[in-house]
Amino acid sequence: MGNAGSMDSQQTDFRAHNVPLKLPMPEPGELEERFAIVLNAMNLPPDKARLLRQYDNEKKWELICDQERFQVKNPPHTYIQKLKGYLDPAVTRKKFRRRVQESTQVLRELEISLRTNHIGWVREFLNEENKGLDVLVEYLSFAQYAVTFDFESVESTVESSVDKSKPWSRSIEDLHRGSNLPSPVGNSVSRSGRHSALRYNTLPSRRTLKNSRLVSKKDDVHVCIMCLRAIMNYQYGFNMVMSHPHAVNEIALSLNNKNPRTKALVLELLAAVCLVRGGHEIILSAFDNFKEVCGEKQRFEKLMEHFRNEDNNIDFMVASMQFINIVVHSVEDMNFRVHLQYEFTKLGLDEYLDKLKHTESDKLQVQIQAYLDNVFDVGALLEDAETKNAALERVEELEENISHLSEKLQDTENEAMSKIVELEKQLMQRNKELDVVREIYKDANTQVHTLRKMVKEKEEAIQRQSTLEKKIHELEKQGTIKIQKKGDGDIAILPVVASGTLPTGSEVAVGNFVGPVMGAPSSGPLPPPPPPLPLSSDAPEAVQNGPATPPVPPPPPPPPPPPPPPPPPPPPPLPGPAAETLPAPPLPPPPPPSAPPLPGTSSPTVVFNSGLAAVKIKKPIKTKFRMPVFNWVALKPNQINGTVFNEIDDERILEDLNVDEFEEIFKTKAQGPAIDLSSSKQKITQKGSNKVTLLEANRAKNLAITLRKAGKTAEEICKAIHVFDLKTLPVDFVECLMRFLPTENEVKVLRLYERERKPLENLSDEDRFMMQFSKIERLMQKMTIMAFIGNFTESIQMLTPQLHSIIAASVSIKSSQKLKKILEIILALGNYMNSSKRGAVYGFKLQSLDLLLDTKSTDRKQTLLHYISNVVKEKYQQVSLFYNELHYVEKAAAVSLENVLLDVKELQRGMDLTKREYTMHDHNTLLKEFIFNNEGKLKKLQDDAKIAQDAFDDVVKYFGENPKTTPPSVFFPVFVRFVKAYKQAEEENELRKKQEQALMEKLLEQEALLEQQDPKSPSHKSKRQQQELIAELRRRQVKDNRHVYEGKDGAIEDIITALKKNNITKFPNVHSRVRISSSTPVVEDTQSWQASLFT
């Protein structure tokens, strides 16, 4: 640790020249125990401690050995005693000179100990016994006293210098007064009170001044500031420093030191404190003290003087400019901010920054630019305020115009939707008529085909008959047969025997020719002909067969080919040459060929679904890389018949796409209560203010309130109900009155009171009204009818747009060819990704569209939906605006079709009830007019409801979903979400392309500059660095970065590190014509550190 060495040089040399041997590693249990102790002593943040716990045993043992080797050798009181010895005014000059030679080394070792030792050592140094902070602040005040005194003596006489020697004593008073520290941050009373007394009630001596001059020539002030910085890096120490009455003042007074490095360190520490809420007030108070002590005419005068004069030390100038930037612009109060800005303006900051605008220091340029970017231009702000008022008036006017236009747009949309629905209904009707015409055409076409076939067969039969007649005449000429005409016009064919006589026997009839058949008996009637056998169309004409026995058996009939009509049986063979002359029956036609395979397949392998439609089996797709799984919900092959997926071909899409690029992007990485009659009788006997009430108290009270709202008498109300007069009784009153329809028990109580002939005057107004109200015939029906009539128009106006939106959305989704193409692309890419693991599918559930955003590319920068959007834009530009074909989908998504259909049924029941009432009172013109005017409207609404239901069922089935389990509130939002996500993906793709293009242009521009200039020239290097800084500033202006420093050990170091990296250059509430204000660096205030963050 930092306090490893002893104070004397011998021990220091011994440790420097003796390296201890490495001890053997203990058992793992003991190792872990000792390692836990070391970690606890180091007081590390949780993330760093977690990192050390991940070390292996060898590294853990090395860390333990290092920690035990550099153990704390000097307790805190050792350093405190030495510092107190330097502050002893009674010590001689010679002895002080000998002691102070090692003061800087003591302070350095103290700083290292404060920075590296465990928190317990620091707490011991700061406790009530040691009061290390008081001693350290007192020594800092002593070390820089001479600098302040010498500076004042330049501008004043010797007498005034003695009088002005009070600041050192004032600055270190009360350090030993009480042991309790004052209350923390913002306690200005303790700071102002220090001017009332001197440390020793005496003026500093000449010896003290000379000793201080001796110390000021060393680095003691710088190392003291480092010690205070190390203390402030702990939560406990930070609170003590902020609570100390003089610590921050002495740090600020250290700006009088002649070392620029010390002044830069002071400004960095003060800037870090300034970024803590509440710290800004402390810093300003310290500079008020600085002004008084150093005799400044204006606050920050010496700071600006150092800033101007130390122009050869860039680090100090950067720290000064950074401090000015933070102390001015980290204030949220705009007026106070302008005040601080004007303080520096009076000190000449603006003119000096104008001179420094061409500085070659990039860090200084960044701080100057940050200050200028956050400067308030009050004149411009006033002009902006006036412009803002005019703009607000214009905005109000535009908002009013937008409101009117929105109303007109809504009316136009409703009108357009009604027209669209009418057109869609006509289209659906025409489609149905077209389907009927197609069926009729199909049947007529079949009949025509059959008739043509019959005509063709008849022509062929006539031709065969003519051929047979020719053959018969030829045989007759040859003398083989003889033709004999009968009386009935038939012709008998008689065969001729060898002796030339014609034997008697049976005859052969061929067509209209009849002849005896050889070998058949001549007597007896002919037997009936055999049943016809099916033959081909080339078979000979029908011949009646007799019982004759032919000399040669007939050939078997050919097999019947499907599906010709059955012709007559074939003729028997003729004897003699006739058997040889007649043509033989033709061969049967070949069997019909098998059905051809589906288009696009090389194999006849098919799958038959329940509709007997053949579906080709999809082969798995082999990919080069392992692809992520797209977790869609697939449809089974028997579920796609009649859906959109039966009409698309995803394999054809894959031929158009660059699947290699796709693989490269998405490859994987690794009502009231009943009234009791007995209780009602008891209420009759009770008297309250000479009135009897039969109704329940709350019910009577509510009825009285309702009747008072109407302002009508009971007679007027009952008469209006009887004639359905909605002009006298508004529908709202009717609906309220329906809650007070008399119950069965109330009617019994009222009738009992009436039968007992008790005076009605004793009843309350509500009971008398209920007496008349309950006597109205069919009261429930009449009240229901009145409410129905009163709400009918409103119900029609409410339900019609909902049904129209369902119809329009359903038809537009089903008829969208562009949407079908999008689904085709999704199916193709999904099968490409899943085929090797899950196999190809034929369709997917619509809920799978929501999963497109969950499937991300290998670099996690884009999703599958982003890729699909790119593919559509590059290869299928014509379908990129598919969402323009989907009409009123968002409105349809908000409709509960089931409830709408129930409301339509309720309207029908109300109309039926009204019709029945009208049949009983046909003289009522109000009911007659209502039925006449609105029955057609209800019929149209019912037709719309039927069309909406059918259209929705069709589109749901078309996409492979179940209408019973997929209501509109589930079906349509899928498309709403998909369209929204698709549009967003398009925008993000476009933005990404623009960014890539801008980056490419920037790189090309830089390359061109590099080619034009000498890369080694200083001006080229400076310009490139400035361009990089400006680009960094622009990026930070775009982002909303809030610098939040939480209360934890090391917070001060984090702030100072951020300051050195120029990470805090933007501040809140900056309004300018040119730029947009950036966000505030926010740091937890000191009180929150003490109250909550340190617990």
Swiss-Prot record:
Residues 521-602 are annotated as: Disordered. The keyword Disulfide bond does not apply. Residues 23-469 form the GBD/FH3 domain. PANTHER family: FORMIN-LIKE PROTEIN, FORMIN-LIKE PROTEIN 2. Residues 381-478 form a coiled coil. PROSITE patterns: FH2, GBD_FH3. Gene3D superfamilies: Formin, FH2 domain (1.20.58.2220), Leucine-rich Repeat Variant (1.25.10.10). This is Formin-like protein 2. It comes from Bos taurus (Bovine). It is found in: Cytoplasm. Plays a role in the regulation of cell morphology and cytoskeletal organization. Required in the cortical actin filament dynamics. Interacts with TCP11L2; this interaction promotes muscle-derived satellite cell (MDSC) migration and differentiation. GO terms for biological process: cell migration; cortical actin cytoskeleton organization; regulation of cell shape. Signal peptide: none annotated. Keywords: Actin-binding, Coiled coil, Cytoplasm. GO terms for cellular component: cytosol. Transmembrane segments: none annotated. SUPFAM superfamilies: ARM repeat, Formin homology 2 domain (FH2 domain). GO terms for molecular function: actin filament binding; small GTPase binding. Belongs to the formin homology family. Its main location: cytoplasm. The DAD domain regulates activation via by an autoinhibitory interaction with the GBD/FH3 domain. This autoinhibition is released upon competitive binding of an activated GTPase. The release of DAD allows the FH2 domain to then nucleate and elongate nonbranched actin filaments. Residues 524-534, 548-576, 583-599 have a biased composition (Pro residues). Residues 617-1008 form the FH2 domain. It holds the Pfam family Drf_GBD.
